[in-house]
């Protein structure tokens, strides 16, 4: 994952056919992309190795999800045991990265057992040369800013920084500046080798851009699919200005749409996102770290 060869992911946990959002990607963008798969999300806690390896056998470039903010919640969030995680890392042929998604590490107690799990997952990623995408936001906490101030996390992140991408998951409209500052600070301080941005459609709902423009309905309320298509790409632009090399879109349910009965195509939101990514790649728009640091006063 570099500025010359950025990386972007699209989630794969909707009712669409598995891999549909990758199949309809323009050919020139496929080498930069991966889909979210495996068995750390929405698949329940049983047969985690088999589910992950079955997904790998489909042949799609993919990203797996080893843990979240709890061991199991309604079969949706699942923590993958470390021996299983290592077997996946050692055996998978098409795995491109491991993501820690909405893991809320910054607000955990110092002796929380998940802290040790986090450290070991980062170390395993370094052992097998797989990027670790720490992707979080600020769900009622200033989480990213807290992570980069705590040695329980920063010590291992700094040691394995070549494999660490610190990414802001835009799941709230408030506290955005602190999150941008956190990922930039992690990059400047050597805690992360690269940084990223994950656009999330709920952000605009939280900011009041749904149903009736300017009307605030509260978090996770209203119809987020009514946001203008260009907003999807707009959410990624701060990452470009910061030198981010990783970009992610949550919610392929609004990035692709049915065409006829069994085919898919990208929606206006998806087209806006792909157009931006193509421009960034073709015109080498991602600034070098030195350029970004030179703008800081």
Regions found by a protein language model. Give the residues of each.
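Glycan-processing catalytic domains of CAZymes
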Residues: 1-297
């Amino acid at each position: 994952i570099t500025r010359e060869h950025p990386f972007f992911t699209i989630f794969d946990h909707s009712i669409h056919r598995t891999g549909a959002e990758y199949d309809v990607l323009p050919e020139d963008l496929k080498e930069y992309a991966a889909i979210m798969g495996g068995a750390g999300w929405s698949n329940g806690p049983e047969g985690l190795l088999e589910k992950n390896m079955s997904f790998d056998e489909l042949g799609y470039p993919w990203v797996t999800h080893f843990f979240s903010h709890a061991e199991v919640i309604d079969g949706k969030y699942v923590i993958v045991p470390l021996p299983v995680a290592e077997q996946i890392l050692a055996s998978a042929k098409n795995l491109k990265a491991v993501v820690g998604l909405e893991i809320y590490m910054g607000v955990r107690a110092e002796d929380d057992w998940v802290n040790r799990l986090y450290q070991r997952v980062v170390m395993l990623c370094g052992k097998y040369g797989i990027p670790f995408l720490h992707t979080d936001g600020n769900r009622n906490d200033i989480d990213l800013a807290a992570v980069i101030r705590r040695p329980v996390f920063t010590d291992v992140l700094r040691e394995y920084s070549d494999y660490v991408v610190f990414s802001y998951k835009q799941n709230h409209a408030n506290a955005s500046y602190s999150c941008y500052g956190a990922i930039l600070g992690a990059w400047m301080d050597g805690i992360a080798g690269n940084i990223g941005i994950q656009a999330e459609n709920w952000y605009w709902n939280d900011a009041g851009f749904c149903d009736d423009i300017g009307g605030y309905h509260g978090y996770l309320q209203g119809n987020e699919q009514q946001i203008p298509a260009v907003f999807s790409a707009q959410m990624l632009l701060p990452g470009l200005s910061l030198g981010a090399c990783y970009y992610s879109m949550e919610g392929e349910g609004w990035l692709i749409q049915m065409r006829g009965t069994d085919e898919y195509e990208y929606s206006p939101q998806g087209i806006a996102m792909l157009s931006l990514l193509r421009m960034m790649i073709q015109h080498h728009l991602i600034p070098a770290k030195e350029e970004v640091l030179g703008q800081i006063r």
